Swiss-Prot record:
It is found in: Virion; Host cytoplasm. It is an enzyme of class 2 (transferase). One of its GO terms (molecular function) is RNA binding. This is Putative mRNA-capping enzyme P5. Enzyme involved in mRNA capping (Potential). Binds to GTP and might have guanylyltransferase activity. Together with the RNA-directed RNA polymerase P1 and protein P7, forms an transcriptional complex positioned near the channels situated at each of the five-fold vertices of the core. InterPro entries: P5_Phytoreov. One of its GO terms (cellular component) is host cell cytoplasm. Its EC number is 2.7.7.50. The lineage of its organism: Viruses, Riboviria, Orthornavirae, Duplornaviricota, Resentoviricetes. Belongs to the phytoreovirus protein P5 family. Keywords: GTP-binding, Host cytoplasm, mRNA capping, mRNA processing, Nucleotide-binding, Nucleotidyltransferase, RNA-binding, Transferase, Virion. One of its GO terms (biological process) is 7-methylguanosine mRNA capping. It comes from Rice dwarf virus (isolate Fujian).
Amino acid sequence: MSNPDYCIPNFSQTVNERTIIDIFTICRYRSPLVVFCLSHTELAKKYAQDVSMSSGTHVHIIDGSVEITTSLYRTFRTIATQLLGRMQIVVFVTVDKSVVSTQVMKSTAWASRGSFVELRNQSVDSSTLVNKLENLVSFAPLYNVPKCGPDYYGPTVYSELLSLATNARTHWYATIDYSMFTRSVLTGFIAKYFNEEAVPIDKRIVSIVGYNPPYVWTCLRHGIRPTYIQKSLPNPGGKGPFGLILPVINELVLKSKVKYVMHNPQIKLLCLDTFMLSTSMNILYIGAYPATHLLSLQLNGWTILAFDPKITSDWTDAMAKATGAKVIGVNKEFDFKSFSVQANQLNMFQNSKLSVIDDTWVETDYEKFQAEKQAYFEWLIDRTSIDVRLISMKWNRSKDTSVSHLLALLPQPYGASIREMRAFFHKKGASDIKILAAETEKYMDDFTAMSVSDQINTQKFMHCMITTVGDALKMDLDGGRAVIASYSLSNSSNPKERVLKFLSDANNGKAMVVFGAPNTYRLAYAKKVGLVLDSAIKMSKDLITFSNPTGRRWRDYGYSQSELYDAGYVEITIDQMVDYSSDVYNGVGYFANSTYNDLFSWYIPKWYVHKRMLMQDIRLSPAALVKCFTTLIRNICYVPHETYYRFRGILVDKYLRSKNVDSISLFHYWSGSKTFTVLSHFEVPHECGPLVFEASTDVNVSGHLLSLAIAAHFVASPMILWAEQMKYMAVDRMLPPNLDKSLFFDNKVTPSGALQRWHSREEVLLAAEICESYAAMMLNNKHSPDIIGTLKSAINLVFKI
């Protein structure tokens, strides 16, 4: 271009605060990807045309015409540039499962935060297949299959959505949705950890720091038993040794409303039964049929003795197959009149811990029937041959009643319409207490008058029974211990020094503590550029005050990557955790994110990263981040591809000149695959040890690192995990024998089956040195030096000799 009037496009011409806020906004629906597997290429082509013409969807088809790993590489490298493009992306996969498995395609979809549909077992005229394809066109650009999960828990009727919209809480509902997804993923990740570390099934217990009710449900979906640990519990205000007999229903109960279960005809039993299944792996379930609410749970290791006259062998087999539990179905009524363990087959639980769920009811003389049940359960609690942990009994007493061993008498969440309560019997229950019928009637009147969400929230009384009161920072951290500390340990009541010491001890002791906290510098950056957040937020250095639309207010400390890495912790994204766990994940997905969620980061101990995660495949790849932000900014600014790499090369050249490297020592290519060739040996002094460049070697400065640094301004960015992987993969590594090699399609594989190195140490550290200049260029000096500084500091710690 010799015309002197021609101006080379650059980022300063376009990027301003409005541009940056727009990028934050786009992140709400980032990665609008659907991966759809079917066996019919012509059908895929038809619907590809339909969805493209109707909604502008970008469509790719993997049909076997190109070798599968090459096809995956080309397709998903292309998609990586489009994930912030505001247009839906659909990939149709029509190759056979023997060529690329369901698991590989699910992992690949989830790596880009996509929805996944597997229908390769459906015939071309299958109504299921056709309906899914029709929905793909009808619901574009938001397909009605959740991202990164098999289920969704949010509003399912238009009236709920309308209520949210008219109260200006639609954005906040997306925050709740994604928060639930996050908790579900953390649980799935712990399940993966238990599997990999071969933790015995009866030891698969996770400690939850702080209280949030969804963990009970999502733990049981992953075959894990939860326990809570809290610094204190508000006094329930009821009778009995723990105040749980008709506890007071006041603002302490109602202030944190969490709706979390999916619509289900037996929804009223889900809260109760998941809680009871958490108390023991041996369950006597009386009145079990049909128990469809249990079918989505994973109960490997549980033994369920189920009594119900409607039980059949088919029901027993189906329940066992769906849940993985050992199910013994008895198709008769339980004998409450016979005070005998053997009469009801309970001798199988001798010398075992047992919990009992009672959901029985009779039409005739129900009061007498309840008295018989109560007497039997009081007797059973006193048996020494069986360790009865807890008994829940359906309670609808209409007369004054004296009770022994009563620990709690609680309203049944979702049970207001039938005025149902649950009595809980335990060895430490009240030895002799009188329950007045008039008192319970008044109590249920008050309960019935509450809103449904308030009624649901009373489940926290049940969860008090699996809660330990104590200081989480003093808990024992033996190897094999699993702890989820998300949205909790970062609370301002926990000094940062103690938290970092606790995490350091966890890493050194090879415990699995997953830690989540606000990201100090990303939050500060969002506020600096004027982003309107989903929650009102004030900052004083690293102390953050949150006020959400529900009226709740709390304070947290923010944390940075470098201070967590100093404590032995590495940032990993929720996306990577769900993808890494995709073979065991049985939680929920989501549809929309929120800026609030993107202010948080999650961290896992370095010992686990070094043991399990140094070999990067698509599940642990930052592929969904490394291209989309830089491509979006480059396209907004109309900066040509070649010009972008030339700008990047100039930054490298400028840095090397500042280190007195003679220009005759290298030859610049300034391309995407090669930054320069070393003509003669030179070294650059560096705090991590000298950077050594040998003659005749090609140097490709890491674009991944630079792209991750830009992404880190907007979303959680796993730069340190990536750096740990680059350090390990700085030499060729053999493919692991226990993984499908298709997961490594984004890597280069040698003919001998080795993964070629990604980058040399020098290429990574050289990129880190130009990182701030690069961010300043891309964001027109509206970058965050703090974000870049903490990333660079942590990377230097990774590579320090």
